[in-house]
Each structure stands twice: as C-alpha cells, then as structure tokens.
Amino acid sequence: MAKVLVLYYSSYGHVETMAQHIAEGAKSVPGVEVTLKRVPETIPADQAKAIGVKVDQAAPVATVDELPNYDAIIFGTPTRFGNMAGQMRTFLDQTGGLWMKGALVGKIGSVFASTGTQHGGQETTITSFHTTLLHQGMVIVGVPYACSGLVNMSEITGGTPYGATTLAGADGSRQPSANELDIARYQGKHVAELAVKLAS
C-alpha cells in the first residue's frame, strides 16, 4: 500500500480547496492510502481572525517527524512574492534532522500553489519550492501535458507543467475553477500512480 500525504498551508481557503481535489485524485488510484494535513499557522489567532484568515479548516495539523512515513508528499502553498508562504517555509526549515538522516531520499515530492493574479508568481513559487525538495533527495513530479487542462485557451486559468495552480484574484474573491480543479485531481492521480510503482 503506497502512502500519499497532501500537505498544505491555506490562508483563505483556495489552497485548501485545491488540496481536497488533489487528495480526491490520489484516492482514485487503487492501492493508495491518502492523508490530508496542513502545516501550523504562525500568525497569532486574534490577528489571523482580524485579517480574515480561515482558521476553521478540518484537516489536522502535521508534524515534521511524520513525513518519512509517506511514499509521496504533495505540498500546497499560496504565493508570497514568488515564493512559498512563510508558514510552509517555517515548517520545512524544521526538517534538518530528516535531511541529516536522508529520511526523504527517493520519496516523491510534488507542489501546487495559489496566486492572486495570472502573473503573480505561480511558476516561480513551485520551482523555487523544488529546491528544498531536491536538497532532501526527493523525486520531483509535476503535471505532464497529457493533462488536457494545461492547454485550455478558452479562459484565464491556472495550471502549469510544474504543478496545479489557481488564481484567487487580487481580493481573493475568485474560487478555483472547474479546469483548475481538474488539473489538481490529475496531479493527485498522477503522483499516486507513480507512488504505487515506486513502492512495489
């Protein structure tokens, strides 16, 4: 049984929604156990509520020590100036002990993201995230162009060969589109299929 973790940080629910569809795609693959978790919030609770952060997310909070228990980890983050969110960075900065042991070497790592605008740094967020995963010795998996949603030209949409993305809009009012969610499910399924092959 291959084990897949979908691990995310979401401020306003966009990445949370994408994570749920990533997990749905992974669960569609036979022989896969899927876990959905989030990283801890670093903003004090009163401040988080004051700025509208979604604090009532159902997914349990992950710990660094559990990461080696999975064959594949699909990470999700909103964009912060072309990079991952500080909450995800803080979590990953605690994985030095895992790096010392080589505990994540050979495991699949994949990334999805959310940006405020079409040109808000979705691709650089994912590719810069890859640097950390490569230092951990993980095997990077993106979204191949076999996923038809990547070539959808009928609308403004997220989605890259590096990983699924969604465009939240400058005010956060736009929710993930059907095309973006299709790409998310594809990514989850694709990673899960590869995890089964690697685990066998």
From Swiss-Prot:
Q: Which UniProt keywords apply?
A: Flavoprotein, FMN, NAD, NADP, Nucleotide-binding, Oxidoreductase
Cofactor stoichiometry and binding remark: Binds 1 FMN per monomer.
**Which InterPro entries does this chain map to?**
Flavodoxin/NO_synth, Flavoprotein-like_sf, Flavoprotein_WrbA-like, FMN_Rdtase-like_dom, NQO
One Gene Ontology cellular component term attached to this UniProt record is: membrane
Query: Can you tell me which residues bind substrate?
Result: W99
Q: Which residues form the Flavodoxin-like domain?
A: 4-191
- Give the catalysed reaction(s), semicolon-separated: a quinone + NADH + H(+) = a quinol + NAD(+); a quinone + NADPH + H(+) = a quinol + NADP(+)
Q: Which positions in this protein are listed as binding NAD(+)? A: Y12
MF GO annotations: flavin adenine dinucleotide binding; FMN binding; NAD binding; NADH:ubiquinone reductase (non-electrogenic) activity; NADP binding; NADPH dehydrogenase (quinone) activity
Binding residues for FMN, per the UniProt record? 10-15, 79-81, 114-120, 135
Required co-factor(s) are: FMN
One Pfam match, given by its short name, reads FMN_red
EC code: 1.6.5.2
Q: Which family does it belong to?
A: Belongs to the WrbA family.
Report what the protein is called: NAD(P)H dehydrogenase (quinone)
Q: What is the lineage of its organism?
A: Bacteria, Pseudomonadati, Pseudomonadota, Betaproteobacteria, Burkholderiales
